[in-house]
Regions:
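Structural recognition of the beta-strand scaffold that forms the well-ordered cores
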Residues: 175, 180-187, 223-225, 234-235, ...
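Aromatic-lined, polymer-binding surfaces characteristic
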Residues: 290, 294-304, 312-362, 391-408
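Acidic, glycine-anchored loop motifs typical of Ca2+
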Residues: 201-209
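Aromatic (Trp/Tyr) and acidic
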Residues: 27-104, 110, 125-178, 185-186, ...
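Active-site beta->alpha N-cap acidic-glycine motif
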Residues: 604-695, 709-725, 822
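Catalytic domains of cell-wall/extracellular-matrix polysaccharide-remodeling enzymes
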Residues: 639, 661-665, 686-799, 803-829, ...
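Bacterial Sec-dependent N-terminal signal peptides
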Residues: 1-20
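Carboxylate/His-rich catalytic cores and anion/metal-binding grooves
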Residues: 212-237
């Protein structure tokens, strides 16, 4: 007996050695005033009574809480706990500590969502058909020949454009129209969240139109082509004969009976069943698609009017006709397949007609459309998947009914508003009840594209809360949001490269990955599915994968009922989709707006970014910010400090840890002058290779350790991270990964504005690097003035080194006084760093 006890004790001790625990968080971080709940997972039956927040920059414990809720076992995790720190609102950078287990680092500030809604548009551009800016090539130029039309069978119609649906190259009005509406709504509600960095064709370069509007127009132009005449609506381009392996769109070898890459079919909506493999689909009418046409044309006309007035008028005139098709042919329209039984099995349609009707009411003011919208809305008060355990693929689509919100938001009848708010609340409540026992409050059924359902419910929660003022479901809203960014069993973001410095899907089911061309950046992957669904699908596996991809990296964390795999051949959980990605634009832009409002920042970020770093302030304002950097040179300090004082100009100084330690008197003089003093790293590390900016030369741990060490030194001068959240990287050289790591620390990279070449004041004759070319001070000054005359210096960060090598005897900083006075005469204002940037990271 003693031997048995000793043996069992040894086994327990042995297992404990390999047991582990984790804290799951939102990797982006949190805005200050929002629901903030982390989840603790342990392979041991651990008791948790409290947890702490530790300030990463000071190492001090700043918060202790007993707001701990045990949630039981989950898969291989014997204990899970919800750790609620919603009442902690102080901006900063933290980690959670619970039972000796530490979470990853995360920030709390008003800017964690800045730029994220724009970021997901990268995937939409990658999915473009007709001309693909990612490939810089055209594709599918022969689309398409007509099917199922009584008099036009086989005829050609120009339906080029739009987006490929996912890794396959099919195009569906069902998903594309929903994607268009989601982006329209996001821009209508939160226009300041979107910027202009790309042309209308998707290639880099501003065109004076917000990028999301470019994307909306790309989609609506295609949708307009899919409705060439009154009553003539098309539902789909291509079919599952496309599914012949991974391929590139410009050389698509799919054969639809006319030879490879020689045109694809486009399917007319006749309101009758069409092919589904060896069977027929369950189409009963045209209304589900017709309603989508109508809502897109109506809202699209409003949004596009300032940018494309003629096109706006054109689609405005089509909206009522499209809705009439749905009135004449009530019922659902499903998609077509030829080889397999897999289709979009949309069964509902009154939601689409409700939204189409209410948008026509908004466009025309005609009350008959509101009456119709209410009639349709009452036929489906709650989208049926909400609270259910299962549903067929896209059976209840779109996954949330925007019509309910639009009626409640725009009716003047208080009773009607209350009715449709109750409808919204009922769907949320059902999902909430289903998720109550789940450690992550995830009440979403584990069906195909569960992340799309998660995003839809998140959107409904936001809209209900903001319109009703009822915050009863705010914790679930936060859990759904955080699920998408890593507060889930697997600890991964569900959006490719967001955040880039974090954990996100890397082995996605994507043509770009299979062809080694890149990643579907910004794409929202399908998300977890029931284990039974995964096991039943054809061709899906996690073993026949690409080199260097682990077969089941998340095996340890699989909850059991559902699975998620970061594997290229798992198209059920790891394939990005176009409609799901577009649906992110509203919640992400909303949280950006909410975060900025909470911290008093300007609603619109007018700064210009490069690889995540700010390289220019607002280009419309005649403001200039002087920035100075140094690692070990100080010969210009006296002149620069005295000149700034004489001219009453505030500059921004960025020093390495070595500089702070070596030249404390200079630092103190600069501080006394009221200038910004920030970090230039501690050890002046080179982050990326000169020959390849994407090639990192430091690890995340090395970067973080170096930055924290630098701020530790700065703290001796009374400079906290909150006082100095902006830093210039060593060598003024970085990439988007470094920017992401910095943002995780609550820091924002700033860099000089290219063009003037003032940063080249460190060069000297005979430099050892042949690539470096000596620039005299006169040349630098003249070039600056030429650049100003041609381009202006609006929003420029003009950089001058605090000192240079002794080999350079011609010191450019000696022209500082002349630069200031000359540019002031030209009407420029020299402003502080904080005033230039306009963010509030403190």
């Amino acid at each position: 007996m003693k031997r048995l006890i000793l043996f069992l004790s040894f086994c327990v001790a042995f297992l404990s050695m390999f047991a582990d625990s984790w804290v799951r968080i939102n990797q982006l971080g949190y805005i200050p005033k929002t629901s903030k709940v982390a989840v603790y997972l342990s392979e041991e039956a651990t008791e948790v009574s409290s947890f702490q927040l530790v300030d990463v920059f000071t190492g001090k414990e700043v918060y202790t809480s007993k707001a701990v809720k045990p949630m039981g076992a989950l898969g291989g995790m014997k204990a899970t706990y919800r750790l609620n720190f919603s009442d902690f609102t102080r901006q900063g950078t933290y980690r959670i500590v619970v039972n000796g287990c530490e979470s990853p680092i995360f920030p709390i500030n008003g800017h964690v969502y800045d730029g994220t809604a724009d970021f997901v548009l990268n995937y939409m551009r990658q999915q473009r058909c007709g001309f693909n800016p990612f490939l810089r090539d055209s594709c599918h130029q022969k689309d398409a020949f007509i099917r199922y039309h009584a008099t036009k069978e086989g005829q050609h119609i120009d339906v080029r454009g739009g987006w490929h649906d996912a890794a396959d190259l099919l195009q569906y009005t069902t998903t594309s129209a929903n994607a268009i509406y989601q982006m329209l709504f996001a821009y209508q509600q939160n226009p300041d969240a979107f910027t202009d960095s790309f042309q209308a064709n998707g290639l880099p370069g501003a065109n004076g139109i917000p990028d999301i509007v470019d994307e909306i127009y790309w989609g609506l132009d295609w949708l307009d082509r899919m409705n060439p005449e009154k009553g003539e609506l098309y539902n789909q381009i291509a079919d599952d004969r496309d599914h012949i392996g991974q391929k590139l769109p410009q050389t698509d070898p799919s054969d639809y009976g006319r030879g490879p890459n020689n045109g694809r079919p486009v399917y007319f909506i006749d309101g009758k069943p069409q092919q589904r493999g060896t069977y027929m689909n369950a189409t009963m009418g045209a209304a589900s698609t017709a309603g989508k046409f109508a809502s897109d044309f109506a809202l699209g006309a409003e949004v596009l009017k300032p940018f494309y007035p003629q096109f706006s008028q054109k689609i405005s005139s089509k909206a009522a006709d499209a809705l009439q098709v749905g009135i004449d042919k009530p019922g659902n329209t499903q998609t077509v397949s030829v080889v397999s039984p897999y289709i979009y099995e949309e069964d509902n349609w009154v939601d689409d007609m409700e939204l189409g009707s209410v948008e026509l009411f908004r466009m025309t003011g005609d009350g008959k459309y509101l009456t119709k919208a209410v009639e349709y809305g009452r036929r489906e008060p709650v989208t049926p998947w909400m609270g259910a355990d299962s549903a067929r693929h896209y059976q209840w689509y779109p996954f949330m009914n925007m019509g309910h919100y639009q009626i409640a938001a725009h009716t003047t009848d208080a009773r009607l508003k209350a009715e449709f708010l109750r409808n919204m609340r009922a769907g949320i409540a059902r999902t909430y009840e289903r998720g109550q026992a789940h450690p992550f409050l995830w009440g979403i059924p584990g069906i195909w594209c569960s992340n799309n359902l998660t995003t839809a419910m998140l959107t409904q929660c936001i809209l209900y809360r903001t319109l009703s003022g009822d915050d009863s479901f705010e914790e679930m809203e936060g859990s759904l949001r955080d699920w998408l960014f890593g507060c889930n069993p697997w600890g991964t973001s569900m959006i490719v490269e967001l955040p880039k410095g974090g954990t996100y899907p890397r082995a996605t089911h994507s043509n770009w990955v299979f062809q080694n061309l890149g990643h579907p950046v910004g794409g929202l992957v399908d998300g977890p599915v029931y284990s039974t669904i995964f096991s039943s699908l054809r061709g899906v596996n996690i073993t026949d994968d690409m080199p260097h991809v682990t077969a089941n990296a998340y095996l340890r964390f699989q909850p059991g009922d559902v699975v998620y795999h970061d594997n290229t051949h798992d198209y059920s959980t790891n394939e990005p989709t176009m409609d799901g990605t577009a649906s992110l634009t509203f919640p992400l832009s909303y949280y950006q707006k909410e975060g900025r409002a909470q911290t008093g920042a300007a609603s619109a970020d007018k700064n210009v970014y490069d690889e995540g770093g700010i390289k220019q302030g607002d280009p419309s304002k005649k403001n200039i910010c002087l920035v100075f950097t140094s690692h070990d040179k100080t010969d210009g300090a006296n002149y620069i400090i005295s000149t700034l004082k004489k001219r009453n100009v505030k500059g921004a100084f960025f020093f390495t840890g070595h500089f702070f330690e070596s030249f404390p008197d200079i630092v103190k003089r600069i501080q006394a002058g009221g200038h910004y003093v920030g970090s230039h790293s501690y050890g002046h590390l080179q982050y990326a290779a000169w020959e390849n900016r994407d090639s990192l030369l430091v690890t995340k741990d090395e970067f973080t350790t170096d930055m924290l060490k630098g701020y530790e030194v700065m703290l001796k001068f009374g400079i906290t991270k909150e006082q100095a959240p902006y830093f210039i990287p060593p060598y003024e050289y970085y990439n988007s990964t470094i920017s992401s790591w910095a943002k995780e620390l609550g820091l924002q990279i700033v860099n000089f504005t290219p063009g003037t070449a003032s940063n080249e004041d460190y060069t000297w004759h005979g430099m050892p690097m042949e690539a470096e070319k000596y620039r005299s001070s006169q040349w630098l000054y003249d070039n600056m003035m030429k650049w100003e005359k041609k381009h202006t210096l609006n929003g420029h960060f003009l950089m001058i080194h605090l000192g240079t090598d002794d080999a350079r005897t011609d010191k450019f900083y000696l022209k500082l006084d002349k630069i200031i006075t000359t540019l002031q005469k030209k009407g420029y204002n020299f402003v502080s760093l904080e005033d230039m940037i306009g963010l509030n990271l403190k």
